[in-house]
């Protein structure tokens, strides 16, 4: 089973991917960040430059992940991905209309990904601003990022119904470093149960 986790900037996608993958022990694919990406990408995103190149770059990152996972996906596994075709389409709204036709051509890269479930995370802007300030990335300016979030979040909400197996989840009040928060996401997304590794009081092993 392939589960994509998507949403606007600062909503907690990377954290949720890592945490759920650690619960299921079946693997995960993040989208990376500074240090993984070509160093020009962040500058171009911030300046609004090269929209087709930026979108194609992330599409190819996602495509490499989905292709690699296809060799490991089995009926009893739950593999998590940060990013989906929906991500590429939602971000088109960031760019001027003159680029939209070319950006839609890039979407074809993701036509074969077809995750079995797409979790669309949404949140209030107050929560997003708090998360962005807490992670304190040097290339991010909080007010600008909150503005980006509002725009992209609206697109995710609008587009989600057109993607099969997508579920929109408001993450406000759900802590991803808390088991109750993770269990709530699993319940809302209708994911299969994970196998708990028991903790025991031992004097000897085995």
Predicted regions mapped to residue ranges:
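Conserved substrate/cofactor phosphate-moiety recognition/catalytic segment
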Residues: 22-67
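Pre-Walker A (Motif I) flank of P-loop NTPase domains
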Residues: 1-2
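P-loop (Walker A) phosphate-binding loop of NTP-binding proteins
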Residues: 8
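Hydrophobic positions on the alpha1 helix immediately C-terminal to the Walker A/P-loop
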Residues: 16, 20
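ATP-dependent NMP and nucleoside kinases share a basic, alpha-helical "lid"
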Residues: 70-73, 79-138
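Hydrophobic anchor at the beta1->P-loop junction of P-loop NTPases
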Residues: 5
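NTP-dependent small-molecule kinase module
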Residues: 133-139, 144-206
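Conserved lysine of the Walker
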Residues: 13
């Amino acid at each position: 089973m392939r589960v994509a986790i998507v949403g606007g900037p600062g909503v907690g996608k990377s954290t949720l991917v890592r945490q759920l993958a650690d619960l299921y022990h079946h693997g995960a694919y993040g989208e990376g960040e500074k240090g993984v990406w070509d160093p020009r990408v962040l500058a171009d995103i911030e300046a609004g430059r090269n929209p087709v190149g930026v979108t194609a770059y992330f599409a190819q990152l996602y495509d490499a992940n989905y292709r690699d996972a296809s060799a490991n996906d089995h009926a009893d596994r739950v593999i998590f991905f940060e990013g989906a075709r929906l991500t590429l389409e939602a971000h088109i709204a960031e760019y001027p209309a003159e680029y939209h036709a070319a950006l839609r051509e890039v979407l074809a890269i993701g036509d074969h990904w077809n995750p079995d479930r797409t979790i669309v995370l949404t949140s209030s802007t107050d929560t997003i601003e708090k998360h962005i300030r807490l992670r304190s990335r040097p290339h991010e300016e909080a007010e600008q990022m909150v503005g980006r979030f509002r725009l992209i979040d609206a697109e995710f909400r609008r587009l989600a119904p057109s993607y099969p197996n997508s579920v929109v989840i408001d993450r406000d009040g759900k802590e991803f470093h808390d088991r109750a928060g993770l269990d709530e996401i699993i319940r809302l997304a209708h994911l299969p149960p994970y196998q708990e590794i028991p903790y025991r009081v031992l004097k000897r092993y085995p």
